[in-house]
Amino acid sequence: MHIVADENIPLLDEFFAAFGSIRRLPGRGISAADVRDADLLLVRSVTQVNRALLEGSRVRFVGTCTIGTDHLDLDYFAEAGIAWSSAPGCNARGVVDYVLGSVLTLAEREGVDPAARVYGVVGAGQVGGRLVHLLRGLGWQVRVCDPPRQAAEGGDFVSLERIIEECDVISLHTPLDASTRHLFDATRLAALQPGAWLINASRGAVVDNAALRTLLPQRPDLKVVLDVWEGEPQADVELAALCQLATPHIAGYSLDGKLRGTAQIYQACCRVLGLPEQVSLDELLPAPWLSEMSIDSSADPAWVLASLCRAVYDPRRDDADFRRSLVGDADARRAAFDRLRKHYPMRREIDGLRVRIQGDAPQLAALVRALGAATT
């Protein structure tokens, strides 16, 4: 078999070399000519996989190492009999770490207690649902908006209008489709509560970037964190300058999440081809640089929360790197956006951390477990 794959997918040889030859290409540049003789196509979100790319090719399986599928033409896949798989939940923990790290950074800058805010999570799928679980585990107030889940399950969901009216912090985790494009348009952005924080780590076009750029100079009370941008890899330089944190679509870029994504499409490919799985992620995932921390039972819980989160991930570094890249002409900035993603430094997830508490401190132990770390 012949495999065409995005060059930035990790562990391609380890998982797929036994299937056949692998041709690695830049994801944004994969063309119809490249895939004409391919049997398997492995991509990330930067590759639009549709009729124009695949018609006339031999491709019988498409795997994307991402949660989202808005870059895949699933209707065409069904018509053409092409099997496919995404990697649901692969980077959910990494995105949650990003959101929590961003909240703690804003709280420190603004001099507020993050536990005193009311959180609104828009979209409660793999990522948003995990974020809701963590925030509630910390004992923080959370409202959740997810119309599809509300229609299917009923339960404790609220409208988007209530999120905007009642929440100080709004974190967006919706897929991108016709119903969510510019979900936060000029009207909804203007309706945000005084001093609200808006975090978008889903898809850039869920927020109207032009409307947000126009609004922020008039509403300096609003604090915005953007990891995703309309028109990627071209980010809006003026908008980035108005954000408290700005990063190049790396919220879910933990090493664990990347490798998990490759493993999930490998498993799906084995199922489609009727082949046994011969490789396990557990045997390929390296030990983390930091695996254990020790704290005293007298430690302040707020300090413990910030220290554990930042020991694993601190978004301020990515923000600084991204801002330094926003120079030169448009071509240079686009290249820098992709370069930051391609050469992203190793980052692990907080649930791989073990925390040793010296003494009896049930409150601290509960906090550590709510974060997803283990106590010893």
Swiss-Prot record:
What is the name of the protein in this document?
A: Erythronate-4-phosphate dehydrogenase
Family the entry assigns: Belongs to the D-isomer specific 2-hydroxyacid dehydrogenase family. PdxB subfamily.
Catalytic residues (UniProt): R203, E232, H249
Q: Which reaction does it catalyse?
A: 4-phospho-D-erythronate + NAD(+) = (R)-3-hydroxy-2-oxo-4-phosphooxybutanoate + NADH + H(+)
Q: Does the keyword Oxidoreductase apply?
A: yes
Pathway in which the depicted protein is active? Cofactor biosynthesis; pyridoxine 5'-phosphate biosynthesis; pyridoxine 5'-phosphate from D-erythrose 4-phosphate: step 2/5
Q: Which organism is it from?
A: Ectopseudomonas mendocina (strain ymp)
For binding substrate, which residues are annotated in this chain's numbering?
S45, T66, Y253
Which InterPro entries does the protein's record reference?
D-isomer_2_OHA_DH_cat_dom, D-isomer_DH_CS, D-isomer_DH_NAD-bd, Erythronate-4-P_DHase, Erythronate-4-P_DHase_dimer, NAD(P)-bd_dom_sf, PdxB_dimer_sf
